[in-house]
Design a protein with these regions (language model features):
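A short, Trp-centered hydrophobic/proline-enriched beta-strand micro-motif
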Residues: 118-126
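Short Gly/Pro-enriched turn/cap motifs at secondary-structure boundaries
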Residues: 115, 130-133, 157-160, 174-176, ...
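A short core secondary-structure module
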Residues: 148, 152-196
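Short glycine/proline-enriched turns and hinge-like loops at secondary-structure junctions
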Residues: 65, 134-136, 160-165, 178-181, ...
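Flexible, glycine-rich active-site loops centered on histidine and acidic residues
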Residues: 96-102, 124, 176
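Alpha-helical interface subdomain recognition
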Residues: 1-90, 102-107, 114-119, 132-135, ...
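Short Ser/Thr-interspersed hydrophobic loop/turn segments at strand-loop and sheet-helix junctions
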Residues: 50, 74-78, 171, 187-192, ...
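Flexible, small-/acidic-enriched active-site or ligand-binding loops
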Residues: 137, 190-219
Length: 386
């Protein structure tokens, strides 16, 4: 029999994360968004709650929860503050999960306790100014030198890049080998030749740090290589698989927040001597949001369950990411419609929900990339390979 009930422990963790989100994140979200302020105090508080190392084994300083439980935490954080949810997605899903799976014991001992405790943040250096979805054609180069590697290149749209102590840098060792020449390096950001620059003027996630990274002759030892030369593409894809799950879970939070705000406003706002919640077309929008929220949550839970049981889940994770991100955009847009003119200003949070949701259809694989992954599973044809 299929079981749709959470365990007592999962319900408790979800409730605790929700209370934290309401108490700590919600009161600051608007001002941090207005001021483009990356709130490091909130980051530290999330670390103290165990959010940054939620899926990391306890022996390395993490909480050791399963993916379904992790998704519950991410949803509750995303319900109030997508900028802070981004911190969890990057540190936990992209960086920590990669080190757990691909790192040496030395990598794990050196970095995981720092990342879980918030002593250090990490960033994921894959995207470049001229390379987004086409990860096999990176321009950043890794040149073998005596005892190590020399890195040259640049990375773009890197979340947490200005605040990270550790950067996962993907570089090409041999352009003729395409994806088989990619390598992944763990690079301390205080390395000579490493620099970052803030990116401002974003539509959403204004409370999240975003950077452009430059690597000008950055030298790292052989021990900085994660996996083997040629493993970089596999490392990137496995990290993105984990990251897509957390983005989807966070978008369920946006859907729920949009629904909650809309129901509250529609029951309070009166026109023609009655609450607008009684109008059939408003109820239609609310009903659509209920369906989208529950459907997105169900897809995320299924992807999490597959991850926890060790079953193949790449397609299901892409399905969850595609549906939940598009649903978040639509639910937030409907929430603005329910709020009318009030939804167009930041006195209410729904306009921020829409701005924050929009980027989720772009990063960690665009909606179009997710559709290609999903279609590949039924056709057996990779649309990205000539």
């Amino acid at each position: 029999m299929i079981e749709f009930e959470l365990t007592d422990e999962q319900r408790l963790i979800r409730e605790t994360a929700g209370e934290f989100s309401d108490r700590e994140l919600a009161p600051r979200a608007r001002e941090n968004d207005r001021n483009e302020h990356f709130d490091t105090e909130l980051v530290q508080k999330m670390a103290e709650m165990g959010f940054l190392g939620a899926i990391v084994p306890e022996e390395y300083g993490g909480r050791g929860v399963d993916y379904l439980t992790y998704g519950l935490i991410v949803e509750e954080v995303g319900r109030n503050d997508s900028a802070m949810r981004t911190v969890i997605s990057v540190v936990t899903s992209l960086v920590c999960s990669s080190i757990v799976r691909w790192g040496t014991e030395e990598h794990k001992q050196e970095w995981l306790p720092q990342l879980c405790s918030g002593e250090a943040l990490g960033c994921f250096g894959l995207t470049e100014p001229d390379t987004g979805s086409d990860a096999a054609n990176l321009k950043t180069r890794a040149e073998k030198i005596d005892g190590g590697w020399r890195l040259n290149g640049g990375k773009m749209w890197i979340s947490l890049g200005n605040y990270s102590k550790l950067a996962m840098i993907f570089a090409q060792t041999d352009p003729e080998k395409k994806h088989k020449g990619l390598a992944c390096f763990l690079v301390p950001t205080d390395s000579s030749g490493f620099s970052s620059q803030e990116i401002h003027g974003k539509l959403g996630l204004k409370g999240s740090d975003t950077a452009e990274l430059s690597l000008d002759g950055v030298e790292v030892p052989d021990g900085a290589l994660m996996g083997e030369v040629g493993d970089g593409f596999k490392i990137a894809m496995s990290a993105l698989d984990s990251g897509r799950y957390s983005v989807a879970a966070g978008c369920v939070g946006i859907c729920q927040a949009s629904l909650d705000a809309s129901v509250a406003y529609a029951k309070e706002r009166t026109q023609f001597d009655r609450p607008i919640a009684s109008f059939q077309l408003v109820q239609e929008m609310l009903a659509d949001m209920v369906v989208q929220t529950q459907a997105a949550r169900g897809l995320v839970w299924r992807a999490g369950w597959l991850k926890d049981t060790g079953k193949p889940n790449t397609t299901e994770t892409s399905i969850a990411k595609l549906y939940a991100t598009e649903a978040a955009v639509d639910c937030a847009n409907k929430a603005i419609q329910v709020h009318g003119g009030s939804g167009y200003v930041d006195d209410y949070p729904v306009e921020r929900y829409l701005r924050d949701a929009r980027v989720t259809t772009l990063y960690e694989g665009t909606s179009q990339i997710q559709k290609l992954i999903i279609a590949r599973s039924v056709t057996g044809i990779n649309a990205l390979v000539p």
